[in-house]
Amino acid sequence: MNSVTLGIDLGKRWFHVVGCDAAGKVVLREKLGRNQLLQLMAQHPPCLVGIETCCGSQYLARKFQGFGHDVKLLPAQYVKPFVKSQKNDFNDAQAITEAVRLPTMRFVPLKSEEQMDVQALHRARERMLQQRLALTNQIRGLLLDRGIEIAQGFYALRTVLPALLEKEDSGLTPMMRDLGRMLLDMWNRTETTIEQMNDRLKCLSRESDLCRRLQTIPGVGVLLSTAIVSAVGNASTFRRARDLAAWVGLVPQQHTTGGKPRLLGITKRGNSYLRRLFVQGARALWVWKDKHPNDPIQHWLIQLAERRHAHIAVCALANKLVRIAWAVMRSGAEFNLNYRTGIAADR
């Protein structure tokens, strides 16, 4: 492995590369296009390469790994303190070379193409959900301007609106009926796309042994299991379960001064989409907590609910689900409700 460390500041068309030797002296300083960068990395002796996480960083990291380099992805907020003087692309690249060599630096795990595919499907589905909600609100708002009220929910829109648009005495002008048909057609196509994406995620979860094992955890279904796998893989980058819980942002924020610890609300750091799914799964268990009081998790939740607010109890349960998911991923076993020793959610 070469002693030179490369820091690359990524862009859409231009990439700024700074190389430093073991003493920290700059030995390379280049502004390159995409093809030129790939040629440089293919010809350069294997070395440590630092890249800030951004759009396209995962792809380039996999390419550079294929050339034999040791590639590390750094969160942008961890690089910023190393930027000296004015902010420009070369200074950013040099800051990356300094940050990547720190032994205590925290890196972003590299994702496989399969993980990126599942993550892209989740993001596209989330976009379609937002689009469906926006269309629903717009249709209801336009009709309310004409004195027509439709109940909330997708079912009412799906069943009431088609008949309303066909009625001659509905109070809608011909132009409004035509516009309503156009918006309803867009809504139906969006709904069909969401169903197709859901079917694809179900198929992926059935094909993945890890997803099937994760779904043995109470509160974890198709969406959450596939989202976990796409985000963290087999969780090998997390040494302990609490590290994964902290990465998801489901641990209390700590503010300690003068030796007096003080815990605040959850940090809400990391993957907000994954955190939301864990909280939704915890809320599903919260609804059924009184139905199965002998269940160990439900029994623990009932006892916690007697001492804490419902929202706090739900977040605590979501934290527990994250830890259980880590144990299932690292152990290679399914979740066993009555297994209290051995692989614990946190050691």
Feature locations, PLM:
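A detector of single, family-specific signature residues
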Residues: 1-347
